[in-house]
């Protein structure tokens, strides 16, 4: 079965319309049909005969259409009779037409002769409508009872009156002799994949090809409806509307509702633009409030900030739940007790979190205050102090700023100026010793077999090279910048290797890597090497790194003098356990507290160390003991040694420097240098009542 769109598109050749047999009468003759099979715009006989017989029901019309599409005609219509009936149907179908929106066929009067019909039939193109000839059946050119086409879109014509018989004698007689007959219907030979099908289906209008309709005669009263509308006008919906109206009413309503609900969607033709209104957040909120009846009020800014600062972020995920269904339910007393315990736990958790929030807030305020002071101090250092270094370095104002800590942007410069360059090392000299170190590293593996027969100094130097590689990997391991593959690994290795070539009498000692690493973080490579070499050339560092026992003994004895002066109770506690200063001071002095304290705090210790010299190193040690005095008094020997070799990581600079400031580096009007000189004299005279670890 062919649909409206299929029947409306003709194939390559013009097929003949098959005559549709009408209902048979009692005398064996065909009863003329009153309308087309669509119930619409096609009338097969003059209007004066329309009222004589009722129109067949839609089911019978559909059966006729299917019978015509099936092929052979009903019995009773032979070949000649079919031809005569087809020829007689031409004048009646002259003025009536149907579009492909109705049934896919258009019936018109054939005014061609046999030769013209045959030529048109074999032309290979679809037969389109032609303009009507003037003066036929009235002034209008069409029959008076014919109605114009209702829908001219995508129309095509199927000719009637020609047969497939090539014999001219069997064809319809030439001219227009027959005036009334039953219309002949048939199906086109539609090839759905052809180009013609596509072209015909895309036709937008065929108004210029349709014959002009003349004035139609009024129908009898039987055909008139209320308001003067004709039955043909009421049934002018077309063949598709016939199926939708009689067979698929629900489906049609659904389709119409879909079309109305989605105006932006159209299956064929141009799609109209859909309205796309951008809704703001305010409009969305208003729609939500109107739909739910709720109003969303934002909290004030001040309250949100206060709750963020003071309210706990969580309740440590404490959730009170009932027992699983497979276990016995709680009793009322047990449920109340659990609820009370839960409330107490949540309250404690909130108190703890509020306390931590206050602590974090206090730390942030202190850090912010410190950053502001550093920013203001940086301007003073850059614009006033550094340009006039030699004049202002000893002034009271500069010393106070120095005590508060150097800004990181000027720290390296101030360190270089404070340490000085008594050794007169230049960047070119550093390159020379660095090249020597590289040559030694290169020849180390090649000459390893010859080192057994050489002197002790060569073995010590080789041991220093191996120790450098091992010690670099343990330098600030939490930063991951000095280990192999880090950005400062090669720089640290170069500085330490160049120093072993520059001072072969000292070589490399464990702890040097931390000092060099701190300098690298604040200075360029050549400047870091210059500061490193001059810093290790100081008397205290040189005594410790060269492991000069006598000098180390003097420093320990001087430290104990000020220890007893400032922390007498803790000093006696250490004496009771025979705990000497060398147990904890060696590590602090070797690394200049860079390993024992946090890095930022160690840098601040270095700031004042560059101002005050070696005295501040021992004063810092006394400040640490004062900070943890109460804890150390409760410990024994083992725990004291473990605690002092690994200090707590939460130590703050404010607490430490407040304790350092409380240490008085005077003993009976004697300062550090005077006490150190007197202790050195006593040791020289043989009084060695000091650390037993250094006695020989």
UniProtKB/Swiss-Prot annotation:
Give the GO cellular component terms, alphabetically: endosome
Note down the stretches annotated as region Disordered.
1-59, 91-121, 156-234
Q: Which UniProt keywords apply?
A: Acetylation, Coiled coil, Endosome, GTPase activation, Phosphoprotein
Pfam families given in the database record? RabGAP-TBC
Q: Where in the cell is it found?
A: Endosome
Residues where N-acetylmethionine occurs? 1
Higher taxonomy: Eukaryota, Metazoa, Chordata, Craniata, Vertebrata
**Which part of the chain is the Rab-GAP TBC domain?**
405-613
- The protein, known as: TBC1 domain family member 12
Instruction: Name the residue ranges with Acidic residues bias.
Output: 46-55
Coiled coil: which residue ranges? 330-373
Task: Describe the subunit structure.
Answer: Interacts with RAB11A; this interaction recruits TBC1D12 to RAB11A-positive recycling endosomes.
Q: Basic and acidic residues: which segments have biased composition?
A: 108-118
